[in-house]
C-alpha cells in the first residue's frame, strides 16, 4: 500500500498503531512487543509509529508494519527501540491534521500510546479532535468522504511509561522500578566509601515534581533525611536535619550519612532546595565531610527489571483487549495497576488528577497533594518517618500499652527478611516496644535461649538493625523446623521471656508454625498472644497473599541468569536451553520468569508434563527454527519448575529434545539452583517489607492490654498479611472461614487458588505456542479452579490464522 494513497476499501484486518512518546523508560520495548504480538494473535495488524508523535506527523517510512518476529528479543532491551521524541509539531493543530491524514492513509484507527501524562494528554486531545480533523481534511481536498468513512472513530488506549511514577490512579508506571533499581544500586555502592571515611553523601534523584523515586530510594537505602516536593520540610528544617544526623552518628554510632534529594525538592515557600545547599549545611554546621552525587540519566538506562517486564507485557496485552472492547462512545482508558490488579481507568480522569496534584503543590496544599498521590505513597511516607529514626517523642506509647514483641524467621532465606525485621525494630523503638529477635528459628529458641554469654533471644538495638537495610538472606538466622518438634520448651521460652506478641517472617513453614501454635493454645496458654505472618519466600506459595517478600528478588536474579543464557543460545543460533527453576510445587516463579524473559514454554507442577506435550513442543521448535532461516536472536528458552515432573527431569527433557531434533537444533540444560535466592534484595522487596512490617506492628498493637482469653477468642489474633487483588489485607488463619480450612492445599504446600495461573496463557500466546496444538490451559486442576484469577479476567480463545504467527 502506498503511503500517500489510501485504498477505497478498508483493510481486511483491523490495524492498531503503537508509539512511545516523551522520556524513554525501561519496559517500553516490552509493551510494544506485547501490543504487536497480541494484535497479531487477535487477527489484527500491528503498526509501529517511530519517533513518537513526530512519526505520526511525518508519516511515510516512520509508520511501519511490525510482524511477529520483528519484536523478538525486545524484552531485555532498555529504552525504546521504536524511538521517542517530544514533538512540537504535534502540539499544533496543523501537526495533528497531518497525523490524522497519515493514519487514515495507513488504515489505522486505533492507537496505543506509551508515555507520560503529557503524551497521554496529547493522545486524548487528538481523539477529541478526530472528527473535526477528518472533516477539515475532506474540506481541504486532501482526503475524500469515501476514504475517511471507515475511520470515523479513533480509539486511544494509554500505557503510562515514565520513570517518575507520577500518574494518579496507578501504583506503578512502566519503568519506575527499573529506575529505582539503578538508584539503589548506586547508593548501595556509595555505602562502602561513606562508611570507610565516615562521610555524608547527598544523592540527587530524578522525578520532576513527583517524589516517588526519592521516597522509595530513601526507604530502600535507609536514608537519614529525605526531601520530596509533596511534603516539604517545616521551617527550621536545617536544625531538624542536623539534629537527627548528629544523634545517628554520635549517640548511635552510625558511620555513614545518606540524604536523598528529589530534583523537584522545595521548602514550604516553594523555594528550591538543591543538593548543593544541603551539602553546604552539613559541611558548615556539622563539619561533616560531605559529597554530592547527581545520578542523572543513568536512572533511565539499562534493561528493565522483572517487574517492569511483567507489567509492560500484561498492560500491553490489556491495551489490545481494550481496543477491541471499545465502542464509539467509550472513553479512552489508561491501563493501570493497583497492588496486583491490572485495571482500566478513564484517561481524562487520571491526567486531570495528576495535574491537580501539581496545582495543589503550587498552592501549598501539601496534605491534599499527598492524599491524591495514592494511598500507598502516604503509607510509605508514614512508615519511613517512623522507622528512619526512633526520635519521635509524640509517638511513644504509655507504659501499659508497650509490648515485648518477638521476631522470628521460619523457612528458607528470602530477600526482604532483614528489611522487614529492620522496619519492625525501628517501629517498635519509636513506639516504646521492646523488639526481641529469636535467632536461628524455633530450634535456636529451644536449644540455645539460655546460652552464655549470648543466648538466642536478644533485644535488637537500632544500629544493629539499621545495617540490614540492603542485606540479603536472614541475619538472625532461619530454618524450616517447626514448634511442634518441642511444644513444651517453646511454651516455656514464651513464658520466660514474656513475649506479648509474635511476628513471624517466612514461607509456608512460617504459615504452618503459626497454625500449630494457634491450635496448641488450649494446652499451652503461653501461645495465647497475637501472632502475624509476613510471607517471605521465593516460591510465593503462602495462602492469604498474592505476593511474598523474596519473590521479586528471585525473579530479578533469574532473569539476569536467563538473559545471559539466551545470549549463549542466540550466539549458537539453533540452540534451546532448558532452565530449571525453584519454587517447590508452585509454578509461580517459573511462569512469571517465563513471561519476563519471553520463554518459548514453561513447565509447572500445576500442569504436569507428558510425552504428548513434549512432542508438540518439539514440533513447534522444529518449525520455528526452520522458519528462522539464519535470523538473529534465534536462541530459545524453556523453563521447567523443579517439581513439574519426577520422570521428565530437566536433563531428560534436554536430552529428548536433542535426540528428536535430528540435528536441526541443539539442546542444553542449565540449573541456577540456590543462586535464585539472590544477593541484595530488590527495591520492591525492600519497600514492601517496610510497609507490610509496619502494618503488622500496627495490627499487633491492637491487642495491647487485652487478656489472653480475649486474644485467643479473636480469629484475627493469628493472621497473615497479604496482597489480594487491589488491597492489602489481614486474613484470619483459624475458624470455619479461615485460611487453614478454606484456602490451603496442605498436601501440595500452596494455596488452593493460585491467582497467577492465567499467566500461563500469556506465555503461550506471546511465544506463539498457543497455535502449535497446545491448549491454552489444559491443567487438570482447572476443573477445580475454573475461575482462579481475579487479576487477569481474560478469555483468549480467539479464532486466529496460524500463518500469522511465525517465530517466537
Swiss-Prot record:
Residues 1-21 are annotated as: Disordered. Allosterically activated by ADP, AMP, or fructose 2,6-bisphosphate, and allosterically inhibited by ATP or citrate. One of its GO terms (molecular function) is ATP binding. One of its GO terms (biological process) is fructose 1,6-bisphosphate metabolic process. Beta-D-fructose 2,6-bisphosphate binds at residues 480, 537-541, 575, 582-584, 642, 668, 674-677, 749. Residues 404-808 are annotated as: C-terminal regulatory PFK domain 2. InterPro entries: 6-Pfructokinase_euk (IPR009161), ATP_PFK (IPR022953), Phosphofructokinase_CS (IPR015912), Phosphofructokinase_dom (IPR000023), PKF_sf (IPR035966). Homotetramer. Belongs to the phosphofructokinase type A (PFKA) family. ATP-dependent PFK group I subfamily. Eukaryotic two domain clade 'E' sub-subfamily. This is ATP-dependent 6-phosphofructokinase. It comes from Aspergillus fumigatus (strain ATCC MYA-4609 / CBS 101355 / FGSC A1100 / Af293) (Neosartorya fumigata). The gene is pfkA.
Amino acid at each position: 500500500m502506498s503511503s500517500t494513497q489510501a485504498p477505497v476499501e478498508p483493510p481486511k484486518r483491523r490495524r492498531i498503531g503503537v508509539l512511545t512518546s516523551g522520556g524513554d523508560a525501561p519496559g517500553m520495548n516490552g509493551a510494544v512487543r506485547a501490543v504487536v504480538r497480541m494484535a497479531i494473535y487477535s487477527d489484527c495488524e500491528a503498526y509501529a509509529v517511530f519517533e513518537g508523535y513526530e512519526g505520526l506527523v511525518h508519516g511515510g517510512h516512520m509508520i511501519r508494519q511490525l510482524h511477529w518476529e520483528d519484536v523478538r528479543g525486545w524484552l531485555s532491551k532498555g529504552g525504546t527501540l521504536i524511538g521517542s521524541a517530544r514533538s512540537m509539531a504535534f502540539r499544533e493543530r496543523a501537526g495533528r491534521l497531518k497525523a490524522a491524514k497519515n493514519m487514515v492513509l495507513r488504515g489505522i484507527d486505533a492507537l496505543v500510546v506509551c508515555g507520560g501524562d503529557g503524551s497521554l494528554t496529547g493522545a486524548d486531545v487528538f481523539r477529541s479532535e478526530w472528527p473535526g480533523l477528518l472533516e477539515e481534511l475532506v474540506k481541504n481536498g486532501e482526503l475524500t468522504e469515501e476514504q475517511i468513512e471507515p475511520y470515523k472513530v479513533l480509539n486511544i488506549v494509554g500505557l503510562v511509561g515514565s520513570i517518575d511514577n507520577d500518574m494518579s490512579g496507578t501504583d506503578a508506571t512502566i519503568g519506575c522500578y527499573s529506575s529505582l533499581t539503578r538508584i539503589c544500586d548506586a547508593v548501595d555502592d556509595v555505602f562502602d566509601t561513606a562508611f570507610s571515611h565516615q562521610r555524608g553523601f547527598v544523592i540527587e534523584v530524578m522525578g520532576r515534581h513527583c517524589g516517588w523515586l526519592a521516597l522509595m530510594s530513601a526507604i530502600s537505602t535507609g536514608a537519614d533525611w529525605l526531601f520530596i516536593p509533596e511534603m516539604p520540610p517545616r521551617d527550621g528544617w536545617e536544625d531538624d536535619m542536623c539534629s537527627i544526623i548528629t544523634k545517628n552518628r554520635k549517640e548511635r554510632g552510625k558511620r555513614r550519612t545518606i540524604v536523598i534529594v528529589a530534583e523537584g525538592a522545595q521548602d514550604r515557600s516553594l523555594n528550591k532546595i538543591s543538593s548543593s545547599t544541603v551539602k553546604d549545611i552539613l559541611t558548615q554546621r556539622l563539619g561533616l565531610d560531605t559529597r554530592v552525587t547527581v545520578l542523572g540519566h543513568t536512572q533511565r538506562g539499562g534493561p528493565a527489571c522483572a517487574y517492569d517486564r511483567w507489567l509492560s507485557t500484561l498492560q500491553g496485552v490489556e491495551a489490545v483487549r481494550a481496543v477491541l472492547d471499545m465502542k464509539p462512545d467509550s472513553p479512552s482508558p489508561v491501563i493501570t495497576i493497583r497492588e496486583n490488579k491490572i485495571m482500566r481507568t478513564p484517561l481524562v480522569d487520571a491526567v486531570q488528577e495528576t495535574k491537580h496534584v501539581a496545582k495543589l503543590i503550587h498552592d501549598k496544599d501539601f496534605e491534599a497533594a499527598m492524599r491524591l498521590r495514592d494511598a500507598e505513597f502516604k503509607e510509605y511516607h508514614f512508615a519511613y518517618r517512623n522507622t528512619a529514626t526512633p526520635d519521635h517523642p509524640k509517638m511513644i506509647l504509655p507504659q501499659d500499652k508497650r509490648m515485648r514483641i518477638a521476631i522470628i524467621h521460619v523457612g528458607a532465606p528470602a530477600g526482604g527478611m532483614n528489611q522487614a525485621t529492620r522496619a519492625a525494630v525501628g517501629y517498635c523503638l519509636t513506639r516504646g516496644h521492646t523488639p526481641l529477635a529469636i535467632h536461628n528459628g524455633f530450634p535456636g529458641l529451644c536449644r540455645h535461649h539460655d546460652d552464655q554469654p549470648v543466648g538466642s533471644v536478644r533485644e535488637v538495638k537500632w544500629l544493629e538493625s539499621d545495617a540490614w537495610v540492603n542485606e540479603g538472606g536472614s541475619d538472625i538466622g532461619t530454618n524450616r523446623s517447626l514448634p511442634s518438634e518441642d511444644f513444651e520448651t517453646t511454651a516455656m521460652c514464651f513464658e520466660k521471656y514474656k513475649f506479648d506478641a509474635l511476628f513471624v517472617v517466612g514461607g509456608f513453614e512460617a504459615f504452618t508454625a503459626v497454625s500449630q501454635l494457634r491450635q496448641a493454645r488450649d494446652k499451652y496458654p503461653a501461645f495465647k498472644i497475637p501472632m502475624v505472618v509476613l510471607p517471605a519466600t521465593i516460591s510465593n506459595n503462602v495462602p492469604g497473599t498474592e505476593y511474598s517478600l523474596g519473590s521479586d528478588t528471585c525473579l530479578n536474579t533469574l532473569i539476569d541468569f536467563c538473559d545471559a543464557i539466551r545470549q549463549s543460545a542466540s550466539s549458537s543460533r539453533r540452540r534451546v536451553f532448558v532452565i530449571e527453576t525453584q519454587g517447590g510445587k508452585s509454578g509461580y516463579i517459573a511462569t512469571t520468569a517465563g513471561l519476563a524473559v519471553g520463554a518459548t514454554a514453561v513447565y509447572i507442577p500445576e500442569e504436569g508434563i507428558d510425552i504428548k506435550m513434549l512432542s508438540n513442543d518439539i514440533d513447534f521448535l522444529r518449525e520455528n527454527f526452520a522458519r528462522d532461516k539464519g535470523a538473529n536472536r534465534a536462541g530459545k528458552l524453556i523453563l521447567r519448575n523443579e517439581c513439574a515432573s519426577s520422570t521428565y527431569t530437566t536433563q531428560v527433557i534436554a536430552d529428548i529434545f536433542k535426540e528428536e531434533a535430528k540435528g536441526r537444533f541443539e539442546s542444553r540444560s542449565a540449573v541456577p539452583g540456590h543462586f535464585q535466592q539472590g544477593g541484595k534484595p530488590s527495591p520492591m522487596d525492600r519497600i514492601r517489607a517496610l510497609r507490610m512490617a509496619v502494618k503488622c506492628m500496627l495490627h499487633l498493637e491492637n491487642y495491647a492490654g487485652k487478656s489472653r482469653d480475649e486474644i485467643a477468642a479473636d480469629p484475627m489474633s493469628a493472621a497473615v498479611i497479604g496482597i489480594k487483588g487491589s488491597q492489602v489485607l489481614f486474613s484470619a488463619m483459624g475458624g470455619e472461614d479461615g485460611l487453614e480450612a478454606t484456602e490451603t492445599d496442605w498436601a501440595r504446600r500452596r494455596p488452593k487458588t493460585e491467582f497467577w495461573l492465567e499467566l500461563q496463557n500469556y506465555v503461550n500466546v506471546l511465544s506463539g505456542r498457543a497455535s502449535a496444538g497446545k491448549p491454552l490451559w489444559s491443567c487438570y486442576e482447572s476443573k477445580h479452579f475454573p475461575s482462579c484469577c481475579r487479576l487477569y479476567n481474560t478469555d483468549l480463545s480467539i479464532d486466529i490464522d496460524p500463518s500469522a504467527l511465525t517465530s517466537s
